[in-house]
UniProtKB/Swiss-Prot annotation:
It comes from the Bacteria. This is Uncharacterized metal-dependent hydrolase bbp_325. Binds 2 divalent metal cations per subunit. Its cofactor is a divalent metal cation. Its EC number is 3.1.-.-. Belongs to the metallo-dependent hydrolases superfamily. TatD-type hydrolase family. Pfam families: TatD_DNase. Coiled coil: none annotated. It comes from Buchnera aphidicola subsp. Baizongia pistaciae (strain Bp).
Length: 265
């Protein structure tokens, strides 16, 4: 079996008490068949740190983006986004998007920043990693306005209903599910996971957040992707092996990666 964690934040894991270092995290992951990890940046400063942190590890892929929580005051950060995203180690643009849950006061700034990421994605032909919280209508509208058919991407840790999923799927986007799908009360997410076609699903941990059952209350890590995979496979009446094969194919296709990645287990 070969699994890929399509979204996590490796630098935020607890390296004081839980892990001895990044290699320790990767070793634990491989024991659970998680062989490739996409670690996601949330700011330009964070991207520069991650570039050094992953130390050229072939099993760890990297994105470049500015999370809506970290809107830069300096416009030069936007120029840096475009410059650094062109780095050959970068396979995706983001994490970007809209988050109205914590901050309603800067909607316009979030939207401007999101549009810049979309334009960068189209220019560089690298997929978007999209964050949307309490903002699905604006997210969809902006993607349409920016001619998103020229770019591709994934809605990460998706928690919206089937209607929103259908619109995004018709626009060509992929849908990624995190440990939230394993929560007993996440009925909407369960139904959406059943609905999304198997050739358009990705899976993720969003480590160190959103630990799946049975690890709720414990810091999340890429190894726990295995449990999320098992849960969704059961929801879709698929064998874990077939589900793992298809989600890995989906990841490689979306991020335009060669199949030799699957020989790195």
């Amino acid at each position: 079996m070969f699994l890929i964690d399509s979204h996590c934040h490796l630098d935020l894991l607890n390296y004081n008490k839980i892990h001895t270092g990044i290699q320790d995290v990767l070793n634990k992951s491989k024991k659970k068949h998680v062989n490739v990890i996409l670690t996601v940046s949330t700011s330009i400063e964070n991207f520069c740190y991650l570039l050094k942190f992953i130390k050229g590890n072939r099993n760890v892929l990297l994105s470049c983006g500015i999370h809506p929580h970290y809107i830069p005051e300096n416009k030069n950060e936007i120029l840096k986004l475009k410059k650094y995203s062109n780095n050959e180690k970068v396979v995706a643009i983001g994490e970007t998007g809209l988050d109205y849950y914590r901050n309603n006061d800067n909607k316009k700034l979030q939207q401007i920043l999101f549009r810049e990421h979309i334009k960068t994605s189209i220019t560089l032909k690298k997929p978007l990693l999209i964050h949307t919280r309490n903002s699905i209508n604006d997210t969809i509208n902006i993607l349409k306005e920016e001619n998103s058919k020229q770019c591709i991407g994934v809605l990460h840790s998706f928690t919206e209903d089937m209607h929103s999923a259908r619109i995004l799927l018709n626009m060509g986007f992929y849908i990624s599910f995190s440990g939230i799908v394993t929560f007993k009360n996440s009925k909407i997410v369960h139904e959406t996971a059943k609905f999304v076609p198997i050739d358009r699903i990705l899976i993720e941990t969003d480590s160190p957040y959103l630990s799946p059952v049975p690890y709720r209350g414990i810091e999340n890590q890429p190894a726990y992707l295995y449990d999320t995979m098992l849960y969704i496979a059961q929801l879709k009446n698929m064998s874990p092996e077939c589900f793992a094969i298809q989600t890995t194919k989906n990841f490689l296709k979306l991020f335009n990666l060669p199949s030799y990645f699957t020989n790195m287990s």
